[in-house]
Amino acid sequence: MNWTIIIIEAIVLIGAFTAMILIPLVKNPVWWIADYPEDIQEEYFKTHERIPSKFFTPTVLLKKGMALLIALALLLVVVWLAGAYDFWSALDVGYGIWLLIDWYDCFFLDWVLFANMKSVRLPGTEHMDEAYHQKKYHFVQSCWGMLIGLIPCLIGAGIYTWLFC
């Protein structure tokens, strides 16, 4: 496998992930409302119309499902470019990059950037500094992301092995 390619892929995918999250969030913080802690959502809904914000709603499942399909497609390209030679090497590359992005999302985007970036706060919750700095909430969400990430990575490694090995 080519580690230079893997590092370049990781950097490019982190940039793409950041853009995919940050652009809609800056334009309309409500877009990702299901990803905010519940106390922030409840404060927002005190002064705004209630919209579906639980994880198992059609809107949220559609957004997350599309993201998983895109991740699966990207995974196939990533492991092919990296030179994966069997199921396990494809899984290592794919899930390794998934974990890197997951941890970047938790430890940098959620804990540092979004916790301190006033422009992504929901209207009416700007005063809730402590709620936006809930590290445990984002860490638990990151753990769920690690588990969910196994699905496209295992499927992708299987498809890759079937197609290219």
Task: Report residues per predicted region.
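Hydrophobic alpha-helical membrane-embedded segments
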Residues: 7-31, 97-114
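Core segments of transmembrane alpha-helices
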Residues: 60-79, 141-155
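Juxtamembrane boundary at the C-terminal end of a transmembrane helix
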Residues: 155-165
